[in-house]
Amino acid sequence: MARALVLLSVVLVSLLVNQGRASDNQRLFNNAVIRVQHLHQLAAKMINDFEDSLLPEERRQLSKIFPLSFCNSDYIEAPTGKDETQKSSMLKLLRISFRLIESWEYPSQTLSGTVSNSLTAGNPNQITEKLADLKMGINVLIKGSLDGQPNIDDNDSLPLPFEDFYLTMGENNLRESFRLLACFKKDMHKVETYLRVANCRRSLDSNCTL
C-alpha cells in the first residue's frame, strides 16, 4: 500500500512538472508572437512615414524598384509559400526565425536613423534591443523543443548573410533607405508567420492554416 502511494505521488508530481513546463512554453510562445507583431507593426509604420515624406515621382520609382530587388534574408533557406510553411516542422520554423532575427542585429542599428518616427524617438536602440530580446526568446524555445538533445542543424554552421548588404547596394541614400525599411518589414512578416505556425504545431490536432 505504501509503495503504491509513493508511486502515485511520483506520477502526480511528474504530471504537475510537465504541466508547468507546457504552461511556461506556451507563455514563451505567446510572448514571442507578441514581440514580433510589435516589430512588424513598427516596420509598417516606419515605411509608411518614409513614403509619406517622398515626392509622388520618388514614390512611384521606388515602388517599381523593390519588387525586383533582393533582401539580405534571401540568402537564408526558408519555406516559400503557404504550403511549404504549413508542412514545415515546429523546430525548423523556430530555427529559421532565429536566423532571420539574427541577420538584422547589425542592420537594425541604422534603422532608427532612416526615418523620423515617434515610436523610436528618445530610444534609437529600441529596435535592436527588441530584436535581441526576441532572439533570446526564440533560442529558449528551440532548446525546449530539443528536450535535451544536441542542437544539430545544417544551417547552424553557415555564416550569416553579409552585414553590410544594405549599405553597399543601391545608387543613392534614398534607395538604400527604402530597401532597408522594406526588407525589414518583409522579414518581420516572415518571422511572425513562422512563429504563429510553430505555435500551432505544438497541438497536433490544430488546423494550422494561413
UniProtKB/Swiss-Prot annotation:
Keywords: Disulfide bond, Hormone, Metal-binding, Secreted, Signal, Zinc
Keyword Amino-acid biosynthesis: no
Gene Ontology molecular-function annotations: growth hormone activity; growth hormone receptor binding; metal ion binding
Signal peptide positions on this chain: 1-22
Cell compartment(s), UniProt: Secreted
GO cellular component terms given for this protein: extracellular space
Cysteine pairings via disulfide bonds: C71-C183, C200-C208
Record Pfam families: Hormone_1
Chain residues that bind Zn(2+): H38, E192
Classification via InterPro entries: 4_helix_cytokine-like_core (IPR009079), Somatotropin (IPR034975), Somatotropin/Prolactin (IPR001400), Somatotropin_CS (IPR018116)
CDD domains: somatotropin_like
GO terms, biological process: animal organ development; growth hormone receptor signaling pathway; positive regulation of growth; positive regulation of receptor signaling pathway via JAK-STAT; response to nutrient levels
Function statement: Growth hormone plays an important role in growth control and is involved in the regulation of several anabolic processes. Implicated as an osmoregulatory substance important for seawater adaptation.
PANTHER family the UniProt entry points to: SOMATOTROPIN, SOMATOTROPIN,PROLACTIN
Family per record: Belongs to the somatotropin/prolactin family.
Name assigned to this protein: Somatotropin-2
Organism: Carassius auratus (Goldfish)
